[in-house]
Amino acid sequence: MKIKQLILTCCSLLFILTSCNNYLDVKPKGKIIPKTAEEYSTILHYWLDEIEKGANATIIPEPDYTSLLEFFAEDLDGTLASSLVNTQLYVGSRINTNQKRYPELYSVIKDCNVIISNMEDTESEMAKNILGTAWSLRSICYYNLLQSFCEPYQPETATETLGLPLVDEFDMEAKPERSNQKETAEFILKGFRNALLYNVTDKDYLFTAQVTKAFMARFFFWTQDWENAIIYAKEVLEQYPMLEAEEYADNINQKLSKGKNVIIASYTNENDIGSLSYVVAQSNVIQRPVSKELVQLFNSSPNDIRKANSFNAQRI
């Protein structure tokens, strides 16, 4: 009897110890762990969809955020509205809202890092489009962070001026310190160059090679690398040439579509969020007339259609 009990005890222990391995192999219920390029593309297309809906102001500014930046600039005169709720005159009234941009941009960076570090498929056409877009999008987010949260870039002091915490892989426990601005700029440039290696041409991914080059031109301009800024700007202009005055006016005022020489735009799909943002921006901006000093900077010649295209006789 004791021998039988001993055998049963040993069998039970063996079963329990064997089960421990399976017990530790936990997979979260209700969540899909990406494996294929198609599954990783859903991570990326979430952000691309937000841009097209005009629901994300941190990557590509949507109408409401763009109008807000105009309110804080020096191009508009004091409000004509009886209420100042939606037509702020002073950036300090919204200064705390800028903090939201920081975690939002790093959230996009996190998703890009997940794709870059973990997607096994690197050879299929879809995988190349996904990787090229992820590299470009990550650098654009860091470029936006560099502009918003760091001192204006000066090459002479870039090694002594604080830049950004640089994260190149998904690690929830990582706490990177801030790099200097030169290191940040080099990190951004590396991402752009990696994006160009994939030569994305599928416009469904928004950030094609030409769009990446356009952002590179802006990045080089911001970091005062004038020679490279000119090189990349010329490359982009070959694909998106300047238009004649009438054609430009028609293209720039198109709603829910990207004009002929518009490189990238938000709010290109009709939806409730984007439509509300557009309506609010339109109703608010007409309450602030353009400053007379700005109007006087434009020519009155037929070839300069900026004045006629941007505001009316009441300067709105």
What residues fall within each predicted segment?
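Short coil/turn linker motifs that delimit alpha-helical repeat modules in TPR/alpha-solenoid proteins
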Residues: A127, Q181, D204-Y205
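Membrane-proximal, proline-rich intrinsically disordered regions
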Residues: C20-T66, A233, F298-P302, R306-N309
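Conserved, well-structured interaction surfaces
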Residues: L80-S148, N194-V200
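Bacterial Sec-dependent N-terminal signal peptides
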Residues: M1-P28
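Elongated scaffold/linker segments in the mid-to-C-terminal portions of large proteins
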Residues: L44, L48, L80, E238-I316
